[in-house]
């Protein structure tokens, strides 16, 4: 019996490997068919994540509408996509100048897209503006700019497209958010407030439009790092707060997030939280042991303020 088990083990492993390969290939093909011929709008397509989403959805045969602040950057992205695309399986992307912090033009741009295609099947709200500093040193003007870009811009774009989705009884809205929609981090008051606000809006919207078969999804990574950003090889220090902050800032790669956005669209997921164990634990502690969480975060602020500045 023991010899038979030993002989069967390689066959079992081979069978499992084969099934895993088939599943991965089927998932890849399913991902592409899920967006083929669909009109997909990506805001802030010039960011690292925006470019990767453009690459993934273009490969899947979507009719892309790429929105960005810089025309030269959009043309460069267009060239990069078309240079590797199969013309028989992909569509020519449409380029649109859009600054979500300029609310006066957002509605016009959204209407332009609808007039051009007649509908939008998938909207990926990706644009985000960040600011860091003590709350009392951040001007109200900057607070308003952050709210315009991260909250009012995305919801304005969404509200223009929503009636069309409801009347067609189909569509999906994906919000790429951030862990700071779950809890606040010191010196990021404006950014965290905008992320809390936009998460609240889309959580409410999800329930409102479910009866019309419109899907609302949120993808919240800890931090989308740049292509070159990696954690420094050094001693993290003994402080629990330092360890937490270092782990928190070591975020996920744009490629990972773009692939997760595609999976979210394909499976029509409602909420995805991308994080390593430490930030996930922080969310748990914030929810069930808030006083402990606040104490640890406050300790980190005091420790930072006690360190003398160089020079």
From Swiss-Prot:
Q: Indicate which residues the UniProt annotation says bind NAD(+).
A: 47, 49, 191, 195, 226
Residues annotated as the enzyme's active site:
191
Q: Give the family this protein belongs to, as stated in its UniProt record.
A: Belongs to the short-chain dehydrogenases/reductases (SDR) family.
Q: What is this protein called?
A: Dehydrogenase/reductase SDR family member 7C
Tissue expression pattern: Expressed in skeletal muscle, cardiac muscle and skin.
GO terms for biological process?
D-glucose import; intracellular calcium ion homeostasis; regulation of release of sequestered calcium ion into cytosol by sarcoplasmic reticulum
Q: What is its main location?
A: membrane
């Amino acid at each position: 019996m023991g010899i038979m088990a030993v002989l069967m083990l390689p066959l079992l492993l081979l069978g499992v490997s084969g099934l895993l390969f088939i599943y991965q290939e089927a998932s890849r093909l399913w991902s592409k068919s899920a967006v083929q011929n669909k009109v997909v709008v990506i805001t802030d397509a010039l960011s690292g994540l925006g470019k990767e989403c453009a690459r993934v959805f273009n490969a899947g045969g979507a009719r892309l509408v790429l929105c960005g602040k810089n025309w030269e950057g959009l043309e460069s992205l267009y060239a990069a996509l078309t240079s590797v695309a199969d013309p028989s399986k992909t569509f020519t992307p449409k380029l649109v100048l859009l600054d979500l912090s300029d609310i006066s033009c957002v509605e016009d741009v959204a209407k332009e897209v609808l007039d051009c295609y007649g509908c939008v099947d998938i909207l990926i709200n990706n644009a985000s503006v960040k600011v860091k500093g003590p709350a009392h040193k951040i001007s109200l003007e900057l607070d308003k700019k952050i709210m315009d870009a991260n909250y009012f811009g995305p919801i304005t774009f969404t509200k223009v497209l929503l009636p069309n989705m409801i009347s067609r009884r189909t569509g999906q809205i994906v919000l790429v958010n951030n862990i700071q929609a779950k809890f606040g981090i010191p010196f990021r008051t404006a950014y965290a407030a905008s992320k809390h606000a936009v998460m609240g809006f889309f959580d409410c919207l999800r329930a409102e439009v479910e009866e019309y078969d419109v899907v609302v999804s949120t993808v919240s990574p800890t931090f989308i790092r740049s292509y070159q950003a990696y954690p420094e090889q050094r001693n993290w220090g003994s402080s629990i707060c330092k360890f937490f902050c270092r782990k928190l800032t070591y975020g996920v790669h744009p490629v990972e997030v773009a692939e997760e956005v595609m999976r979210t669209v394909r499976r029509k997921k409602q909420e995805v939280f991308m994080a390593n164990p430490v930030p996930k634990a922080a969310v748990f502690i914030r929810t069930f042991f808030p006083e402990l969480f606040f104490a640890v975060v406050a300790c980190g602020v005091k420790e930072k303020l006690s360190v003398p500045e160089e020079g």
